[in-house]
């Protein structure tokens, strides 16, 4: 594997689209989220407190397997949502909502931390940061009915967890993409700017930011 970039961000922020566009231009290989055939999901939606732990362990094992397969690839790769987000964002949120019991959550964390130690980390995490109104707009545009019912308060809470996680994450550099200001779907100049910043970060530049002037001129 040459370069390994993971794209992170809230529901509907545009992770998959950015992965597709970066791979098309950079000629890298995309690794998308594993298809969800979680056998616990029907039970989970009926009774979250009973089935949250089992459901999250299933998702974690799928994500770990996908991460392992990715690391055996010979070329450069871009991953759509990382294994870290399962634990640090979604399982953590269920715990905060008291849908996972303390004992189960601590067991889950120990399992996650023990396994992650053996995984090669990305060279770079791209965090697409966007406000709830931007997320709602993009969710509506992609037209998934079940997503349009998502409570804005839920998206807000996930944003809080994403901000906290990316601030503390130290396994590799994190480049924050201002999703409210950059429309990499409709504006090729914005996409070019993102690629420029990604390449700067991957070549070792320590401080890489998106300035207002650059964004306005793109």
Residue ranges and their predicted role:
Residues 7:
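Hydrophobic anchor at the beta1->P-loop junction of P-loop NTPases
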Residues 10:
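P-loop (Walker A) phosphate-binding loop of NTP-binding proteins
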Residues 18-19:
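Post-Walker A alpha-helix
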Residues 63-103:
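A basic- and aromatic-enriched beta-loop-alpha substructure that forms the phosphate/nucleotide-
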Residues 89-163:
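A glycine- and Lys/Arg-enriched "phosphate-lid" helix/loop adjacent to the NTP-binding pocket
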Residues 140-149, 153-218:
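NTP-dependent small-molecule kinase module
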């Amino acid at each position: 594997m040459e370069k390994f970039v993971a794209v992170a961000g809230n529901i509907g922020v545009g992770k998959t689209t950015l992965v597709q566009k970066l791979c098309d231009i950079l000629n890298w290989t995309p690794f998308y989220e594993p298809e969800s055939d979680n056998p616990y999901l029907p039970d989970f939606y009926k009774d979250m407190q009973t089935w949250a732990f089992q459901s999250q362990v299933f998702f974690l094992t799928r994500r770990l397997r996908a991460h392992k397969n990715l690391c055996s690839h010979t070329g450069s790769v871009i991953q759509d949502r990382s294994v870290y987000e399962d634990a640090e964002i979604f399982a953590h949120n269920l715990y905060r909502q008291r849908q996972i019991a303390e004992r189960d959550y601590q067991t889950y964390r120990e399992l996650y931390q023990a396994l992650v130690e053996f995984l090669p980390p990305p060279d770079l995490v791209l965090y697409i940061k966007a406000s709830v109104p931007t997320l709602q707009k993009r969710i509506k545009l992609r037209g998934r009915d079940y997503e349009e019912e998502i409570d804005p308060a839920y998206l807000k809470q996930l944003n809080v967890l994403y901000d906290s996680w990316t601030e503390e994450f130290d396994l590799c550099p994190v480049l924050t993409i201002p999703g409210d200001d950059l429309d990499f779907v409709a504006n090729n100049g914005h996409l070019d700017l993102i690629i420029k910043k990604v390449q700067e970060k991957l070549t070792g530049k320590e401080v890489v930011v998106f300035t207002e002037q650059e964004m306005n001129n793109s």
